[in-house]
Amino acid sequence: MADSVRRVLEEMVPELEDMEQKGYFSRGEIRVIVQKRQDLEYNLQRRAALKKDFLRSIEYEKSLERLRVLRKKQRNIEGASSLSDHCIVRRTHKLYERMLRKFKGDLSLWNDWIQFCASSKSARQMSKALTRAMQLHPNSAAIWTYAAAWEFEHNHNAT
């Protein structure tokens, strides 16, 4: 378990370095982020990870992204898009995917992911989420209706 947590933490080194270099977070804040993510990841790696563990991790990543966006605006951080501009949203999507692999039958979790895709403007992830949700919940009229509306409005595809 410790090896897999260490691997996850090592994978985030480039994005954390980029966030520090761009000025989103200080070195001390990066240490706190790493410690918090490590604690959350240990909870997810347990034999019986709970739904609330995944939701807690997702909420932490969402709040971290809100803080990053706020600081970008406040500090007038500009320049070319880099790893730090997308890594937290990508990590949040991965957490949703891991959670929904384990809790496939919970329709409210699928709705949460779909809403996150919409709010983060993640079109590819939205397609993926809607497709998987429709496959696993073929009798859910709400998902089919939302998928049809999204396909029509965002992809301009009426068929």
Where in the sequence are the language-model features?
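Alpha-helical solenoid scaffolds in eukaryotic macromolecular assemblies
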Residues: 1-159
